[in-house]
């Protein structure tokens, strides 16, 4: 289907509408609804025609919408392979590369920035990746409403917004309630893999994960691991190296 004819030029496309409908919420430590807030800066940005066309033409295959019941992963992917969730995949190149390199896994990416969603879908189409689905919605609501307990094989969180100022640390996505929720969603033996190029956030992640029940740190030194070969080098990591930052990976297994 073409989206370039004159009749459709002035009409809002699916991608245009999606860019304006991302909603997020905040919950208390006990899990009760509190108010709308963001653990990220909502940079919807301007979709390029390339990104817009990718969303308009391929969302039907790659896209999943928020719903009020758990996703049926075997029906969605057509198999019973483990599902790895990545929250905040940016432009999606590393996520697509991991899906391409690991056909025995299914990947589910959540990203609220629509240019990144469009870029990820375009790259997935280019590479012919079929074991990947994308959600453009707040991760908190997806975890609450759409992901059944004990249904995920892993969680990836690479270079989330560190919220540098102390008064903004409460906005960091890695909080005890978040980790507890993820742990509930994991199958036994499932993993949590986080990475950051901000040492203070790495220490925060480590403290939160250490306090969580039912998780085991795979680090021989009980803190961080070297970047594993299976995690692609991201543009954020390259930026960190240029700025002289270290990079800290954390890898935990659900017992």
Curated annotation (Swiss-Prot):
Pathway: tRNA modification; N(7)-methylguanine-tRNA biosynthesis. Its EC number is 2.1.1.33. Belongs to the class I-like SAM-binding methyltransferase superfamily. TrmB family. Keywords: Methyltransferase, S-adenosyl-L-methionine, Transferase, tRNA processing. PROSITE patterns: SAM_MT_TRMB. Catalyzes the formation of N(7)-methylguanine at position 46 (m7G46) in tRNA. It comes from the Bacteria. InterPro entries: SAM-dependent_MTases_sf (IPR029063), tRNA_(Gua-N-7)_MeTrfase_Trmb (IPR003358), tRNA_methyltr_TrmB_bact (IPR055361). Pfam families: Methyltransf_4. It catalyses: guanosine(46) in tRNA + S-adenosyl-L-methionine = N(7)-methylguanosine(46) in tRNA + S-adenosyl-L-homocysteine. One of its GO terms (molecular function) is tRNA (guanine(46)-N7)-methyltransferase activity. The active site is at residue 161. GO terms for cellular component: tRNA methyltransferase complex. S-adenosyl-L-methionine binds at residues 86, 111, 138, 161. Substrate binds at residues 165, 197, 234-237. This is tRNA (guanine-N(7)-)-methyltransferase.
């Amino acid at each position: 289907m073409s989206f370039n004819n004159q009749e459709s030029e002035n009409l809002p496309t699916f991608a245009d509408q999606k860019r304006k409908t991302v909603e997020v919420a905040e919950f208390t430590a006990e899990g009760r609804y509190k108010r709308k807030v963001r653990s990220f800066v909502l940079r919807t940005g301007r979709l390029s025609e390339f990104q817009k066309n990718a969303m308009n033409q391929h969302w039907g295959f790659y896209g999943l919408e928020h719903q009020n019941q758990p996703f049926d992963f075997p029906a969605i992917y057509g198999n019973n392979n483990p599902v790895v969730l990545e929250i905040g995949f940016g432009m999606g190149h590393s996520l697509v590369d991991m899906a391409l390199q690991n056909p025995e896994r299914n990947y589910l990416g959540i990203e609220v920035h629509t240019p990144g969603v469009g870029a990820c879908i375009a790259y997935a189409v280019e590479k012919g990746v079929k074991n990947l689905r994308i959600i453009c919605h707040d991760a908190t609501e997806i975890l609450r409403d759409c992901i059944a307990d004990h249904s995920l094989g892993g969680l990836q969180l690479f270079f989330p917004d560190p919220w540098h100022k102390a008064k903004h640390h409460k906005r960091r996505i890695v909080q005890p309630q978040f980790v507890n929720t993820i742990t509930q969603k994991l199958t036994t033996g499932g993993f949590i893999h986080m990475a950051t190029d901000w040492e203070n956030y790495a220490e925060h992640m480590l403290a939160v994960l250490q306090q969580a029940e039912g998780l085991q740190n795979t680090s021989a030194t009980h803190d961080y691991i070297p970047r594993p070969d299976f995690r692609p080098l991201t543009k954020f990591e390259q930026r960190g190296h240029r700025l002289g930052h270290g990079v800290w990976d954390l890898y935990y297994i659900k017992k």
